[in-house]
Amino acid sequence: MNYFELFSLLPSYDVDTALLADRYRELQRAVHPDKFANASEQDKRLSVQRTAQINDAFQTLKNPIQRAEHLLALKGLELSHESTTLKDTQFLMQQMDWRESLEEIKHSDDPDSEIAELYDSFEQYAKHITAELKLLLVSELEADHLQAADQIRKLKFMAKLQDELTRVEDALLD
């Protein structure tokens, strides 16, 4: 199912989140199970299924990584539940550096500045990856779609690393 069509949006990495939320509320009102309280059992089931579908679509489209995966799926490249590893050695080296920095924060004399530095490093890298990803997603070339998949894998890794940094920061505050 094309979630962009469901929400009457053009398929794009960039989505107007306010418009997305408005369309979500409109769709929810139209199919909400309460509207079908006196309907047949089949109509009630369909309403519940449609509501779940709308919720899934909304969650996918409001999350940039999931939205990018959906765009690739619409082009025939399915990434969900995959276990492909990245072969980008430069990224793998950067990943190791970030992990070392994360470990060093725990023993640092100035953890706040190191945390801020890592957040900034993550943000800059993610912006770079996202800019490349946007260009690759509009392409019709399969090779570009494969590269886009690698960029998505990097963004997924960055999100996990960001979560780890947040946990380290929270632990220091305790």
Swiss-Prot record:
InterPro entries for this protein: DnaJ_domain (IPR001623), HscB (IPR004640), HscB_C_sf (IPR036386), HscB_oligo_C (IPR009073), J_dom_sf (IPR036869)
Residues in J domain copies: 2-74
Stated family: Belongs to the HscB family.
Pfam families: HSCB_C
Statement: the UniProt record of this protein carries the keyword Iron: no
Signal peptide boundaries: none
GO cellular component labels: iron-sulfur cluster transfer complex
One example of a Gene Ontology biological process annotation: [2Fe-2S] cluster assembly
Cytoplasm is among the record's keywords: no
Designated name of the protein: Co-chaperone protein HscB homolog
Organism: Shewanella pealeana (strain ATCC 700345 / ANG-SQ1)
Record's subunit section: Interacts with HscA and stimulates its ATPase activity.
Entry keywords, A to Z: Chaperone
Function: Co-chaperone involved in the maturation of iron-sulfur cluster-containing proteins. Seems to help targeting proteins to be folded toward HscA.
Ranges annotated as spanning the membrane: none
Domain of life of the native organism: Bacteria
GO MF annotation terms: ATPase activator activity; protein-folding chaperone binding
